[in-house]
C-alpha cells in the first residue's frame, strides 16, 4: 500500500482505531517530506509533516499494509453495502416485474457490481479458511503432530498468497478506469533554454532514446514524426507516435520537466569541469481517432515553405515543409521531417489533432470538477517531476519520493523505467481508493 493511503487512513478523523503502531517504521528507511497542496482535500485545514515515507517498501510490508487497508472499517463497510446492493438487484431482477427501461438500468448496475461481489465473497471464504486453519493449528500437539504442523504452515502460505492476490484484484476493480488509457500517444521532447544549452540538448537526446528503447521493451510501435538535431550529438526537439497496448496508461505520468545534474563530457560546458544543471520537457498527448476530433477546413490556414537543415540541394528547391494554423485556438504545428509535402502535411494534421484532443480532455476534466488531484502530480507541463543526478548516479522522482541507482541502466529504458512507471500507477490507484473511501464516509454522515 502506498504511503499516501497510509497517511489518509492515519489522519482521517472518522477512522478511529487505526493506531500508529500498525505502521511498521524503520527510521533509517524513512525521511521527512512536506505533503503539498495536491493532498489538501484529504487533510482539510491540517498543516503537518508526516513521517510515513519509505523509499523501498519490502514485499512483506506491502502485503501487511494491503491487509490493514482491507481490514479497515471504512472499506469493510463500503464493500458490505455494495454486496447488499448486488443481492438486492439480483432478487429484484429475478422476482419483481419491472418495465424495460428500468430493467436495462438495473442490468447495467448489476453487471458493474458482479465482479466486485464475486471477489468480496471469495475473500470472505478465504478468510474463513484461514480461521479454520489457525484453529486447527492451536489444537495440535507440538510433538505428536509436527508433520501436520508443517503441512498446515505450507497451506497457510498458499492461502496468504491467494488472499493477497484477491486484495490486489479487488483494489484494481475499485479504481475508476480512465477512458483514454488505451489510446496511442504522440510524445514530444524539447530541450530547455538555459545557459550552456548543450547540456540540455544532450540530455534531451538521451531521454528521447530512453522512451524509444522503452517502446521496444513493451513491444510497442515507435514512429518518428519530427527530429531536430543539435550540436555535439544533442537534440533540440523531437516527436514520435507510439502505438500499442495501453500506451497512454503507462506514459501519461511522464509529461513534465525532467532535470539533469552532471559534469558535461562534450560541448562548451565541458571546459569548466563543474556540475551543470539543465532541463528538458516531455509532453504526452493521447492520440485521438478521426471521429474524436473533426477539423473544419474553414478553421485552418496551411502554409508551405522550404525545409531547413541538412538534405542537400533538395531542401532549397522545394516547398516541402508544412505549417498548420488552427485559427480558433491559435495552435501552430510545423513539420519538415519528410521530403514529401504530402507526408509532412499528414504528420502535421496528426499532431494538430492530438493537441486539440488534449484540450478536449483537459476541458472534460475541469467540467467534472473532481476533488482528486493525483499524488503523482497534476501532469502540468511546467511541473518538475524527476531529477537525474549523474554525479551521485541517482534518479529521483519527486512525486512519490522514489529513488533508483545506476542512471545508465535506467536510461536504457528497460526494467528500471518500467518499475518506476508501475509504482506511479500504483500510487495513483491507491489515491483513487482513498478518495472513494473519503466520499463514502462523507455520504454516510
UniProtKB/Swiss-Prot annotation:
Where's it mainly located?
Answer: mitochondrion
Keyword set, alphabetical order? Methylation, Mitochondrion, Protein biosynthesis, Transit peptide
Q: Which InterPro entries match?
A: PCRF (IPR005139), Pep_chain_release_fac_I (IPR000352), Pep_chain_release_fac_I_sf (IPR045853), Prokaryotic/Mito_RF (IPR050057)
A Pfam family recorded for this sequence: RF-1
Q: How is it modified after translation?
A: Methylation of glutamine in the GGQ triplet by HEMK1 is conserved from bacteria to mammals.
List locations, semicolon-separated: Mitochondrion
Q: Where is motif GGQ found? A: 311-313
Q: Which residues belong to the signal peptide in this entry? A: none
Question: What segment(s) does the record annotate as region GGQ domain?
Answer: 297-361
Q: Which residues carry this modification: N5-methylglutamine?
A: 313
Claim: Zinc is one of the keywords in the record: no
GO CC terms, sorted = mitochondrion
Q: Relay the domain remarks.
A: The GGQ domain interacts with the peptidyltransferase center (PTC) of the large ribosomal subunit to trigger nascent chain hydrolysis.
Function description: Mitochondrial peptide chain release factor that directs the termination of translation in response to the peptide chain non-canonical stop codons AGG and AGA. Non-canonical termination codons AGG and AGA are found at the end of MT-CO1/COX1 and MT-ND6/ND6 open reading frames, respectively.
What name does the UniProt record give this protein? Peptide chain release factor 1, mitochondrial
Lineage start: Eukaryota, Metazoa, Chordata, Craniata, Vertebrata
**Gene behind this protein:** MTRF1
Amino acid at each position: 500500500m502506498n504511503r499516501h493511503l497510509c497517511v489518509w487512513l492515519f489522519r482521517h478523523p472518522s477512522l478511529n482505531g487505526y493506531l500508529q503502531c500498525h505502521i511498521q517504521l524503520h527510521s533509517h528507511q524513512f525521511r521527512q517530506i512536506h505533503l503539498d497542496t495536491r493532498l489538501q482535500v484529504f487533510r482539510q485545514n491540517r498543516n503537518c509533516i508526516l513521517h510515513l515515507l519509505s523509499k523501498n517498501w519490502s514485499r512483506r510490508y506491502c502485503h501487511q499494509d494491503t491487509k490493514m487497508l482491507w481490514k479497515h472499517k471504512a472499506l469493510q463497510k463500503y464493500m458490505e453495502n455494495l454486496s447488499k446492493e448486488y443481492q438486492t438487484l439480483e432478487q429484484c431482477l429475478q422476482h419483481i416485474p419491472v418495465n424495460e427501461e428500468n430493467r436495462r438500468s438495473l442490468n447495467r448496475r448489476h453487471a458493474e457490481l458482479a465482479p466486485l461481489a464475486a471477489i468480496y465473497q471469495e475473500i470472505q471464504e478465504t478468510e474463513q479458511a484461514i480461521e479454520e486453519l489457525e484453529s486447527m493449528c492451536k489444537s495440535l500437539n507440538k510433538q505428536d503432530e509436527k508433520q501436520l504442523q508443517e503441512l498446515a504452515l505450507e497451506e497457510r502460505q498458499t492461502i496468504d498468497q491467494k488472499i493477497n492476490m484477491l486484495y490486489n484484484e479487488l483494489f484494481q476493480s475499485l479504481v475508476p478506469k480512465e477512458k483514454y488509457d488505451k489510446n496511442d500517444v504522440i510524445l514530444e521532447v524539447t530541450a530547455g533554454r538555459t545557459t550552456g544549452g548543450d547540456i540540455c540538448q544532450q540530455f534531451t537526446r538521451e531521454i528521447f532514446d530512453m522512451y524509444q528503447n522503452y517502446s521496444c521493451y513493451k513491444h510497442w510501435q515507435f514512429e518518428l514524426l519530427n527530429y531536430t538535431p543539435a550540436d555535439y550529438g544533442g537534440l533540440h526537439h523531437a516527436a514520435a507516435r507510439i502505438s500499442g497496448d495501453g500506451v497512454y496508461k503507462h506514459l501519461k505520468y511522464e509529461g513534465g520537466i525532467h532535470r539533469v545534474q552532471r559534469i558535461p563530457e562534450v560541448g562548451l560546458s565541458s571546459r569548466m569541469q563543474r556540475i551543470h544543471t539543465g532541463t528538458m520537457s516531455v509532453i504526452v498527448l493521447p492520440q485521438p481517432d478521426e471521429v474524436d476530433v473533426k477539423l473544419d477546413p474553414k478553421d485552418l490556414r496551411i502554409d508551405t515553405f522550404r525545409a531547413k537543415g541538412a538534405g542537400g540541394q533538395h531542401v532549397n528547391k522545394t516547398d516541402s515543409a508544412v505549417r498548420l494554423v488552427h485559427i480558433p485556438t491559435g495552435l501552430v504545428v510545423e513539420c519538415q521531417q519528410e521530403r514529401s509535402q504530402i507526408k509532412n502535411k499528414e504528420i502535421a494534421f496528426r499532431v494538430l489533432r492530438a493537441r486539440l484532443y488534449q484540450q478536449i480532455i483537459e476541458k472534460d476534466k475541469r467540467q467534472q470538477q473532481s476533488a482528486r488531484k493525483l499524488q503523482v502530480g497534476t501532469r502540468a507541463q511546467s511541473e518538475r517531476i524527476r531529477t537525474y543526478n549523474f554525479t551521485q548516479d541517482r534518479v529521483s522522482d519527486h512525486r512519490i519520493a522514489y529513488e533508483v541507482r545506476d542512471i545508465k541502466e535506467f536510461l536504457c529504458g528497460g526494467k528500471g523505467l518500467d518499475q518506476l512507471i508501475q509504482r506511479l500507477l500504483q500510487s495513483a490507484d491507491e489515491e483513487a481508493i482513498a478518495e472513494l473511501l473519503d466520499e463514502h464516509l462523507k455520504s454516510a454522515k
